[in-house]
Amino acid sequence: MIIRTEKLQVGYGNKPVVTDINLDLLAGQFVGLLGPNGSGKSTILKTIIRLLAPLGGDVYLGDVKLHQLSNHDMAKTTAVVLTDPIMPGLLNVYDIVMLGRHPHTGFTGKPADDDHQKVLAALEMVNASNLKTRYFTELSDGEKQKVLLARALAQEPKLIVLDEPTSHLDARHRIEVLLILRQLTQGKGVTVVASLHDIDLAMKACDVVILVKDEHILACGTPEDMLTDNLVAELYTMEQATFSNKLGGVELRSQQGNGLIFVVAGSSSGSSLYRALAKHRFSIVTGILSESEIDFNVAQAIGAKIISVPPYDYIKAEITAEALRLIEGAAVVIDAGFPIGTLNRPNIELINYALKKGLVVGTLRDRSEAAKLYGNQAGKMHHYQDYFELISAVRKIYQ
């Protein structure tokens, strides 16, 4: 056990922010704190590292109460990377990382050869050896974060606490930082506790997530168990977006406004199209989908009306009839370019029906493929080269 809390209350002055915190965090775990802004994630972290005194309860580092540890022992066991920018003046990267060796340098504070070796090893581990002679102030945000991680590594801690370590970083540096943290937990047995805002990254990187809301811990456990659609909706109170555990991310919900579009899709052909239409506030009906495929999950997450069948089931006549009825309520029908197999052949019937009814039918297929599938009817179709062209054309129809 690295960190244990018993009936912990954290806050400022006499005002509690989060109460009744009871946690048991193990060696080698990557622990993520998730919650809305102002929920108390940073307050919990600042209490764990003694920047704030607990308002009640206890924090244990190993078997020792936190307040019983000397500053020297605390520095040997715990490294901290906060969001507050540091202003190191003319210190270069090597000097910054060497600061992490200070708890190990003895009375004189003079680094030994072993300390220099560990600084170089820390820089290499975060892929920042090429930065060692540069001034810290010259670095990009992503490079600075890697250097601060190297400083934390140089301390050789059992626990690293980070406040929003991926904020202000581009996609590449976010992934790089999280992979470094994963390497620390798995390779060196270091416990990492970090506040995070990216639900999808927390789901993929963390061993444990702690959900914080309304002055209490809403849930704590593995992200696979805790980051369910319902719990994330409760945590963030999202009305115009939906988190999907199956997709591992957030989808914008389709909003009624610009008109109703029927999308004939399947086998992942519709997913990007659904997102594009939802972004432009079109109402979406889609089918006929198998409930085991990604198109079904994306359509469900964005709030589209779905005509579907169970996995690997044939499309029955009554399901086709329902889809045909809904097509009549749409001014535009889109063929997403779905592949044709034995189970989904009735979807071709949907497109032919829309063409016979004189509806506007668009397709993302090339003309030769459309002609093979729909025969002479294909001449009535509007062909779009990409999503931009499709969305532009559909918006003109509803103007």
Q: Where are each of the predicted segments found?
A:
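Helix-to-loop junction immediately C-terminal to a conserved catalytic motif
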Residues: 49
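Conserved ABC transporter NBD signature motif
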Residues: 57-65
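ABC ATPase nucleotide-binding domains
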Residues: 237-317, 335-336, 362-399
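Conserved ABC ATPase "signature" region
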Residues: 98, 113-132
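Conserved catalytic motifs of ABC-family nucleotide-binding domains
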Residues: 156
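The feature captures the beta-strand-to-loop junction immediately N-terminal to the Walker
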Residues: 34-36
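Catalytic Walker B motif of ABC-type/P-loop ATPase nucleotide-binding domains
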Residues: 160-164
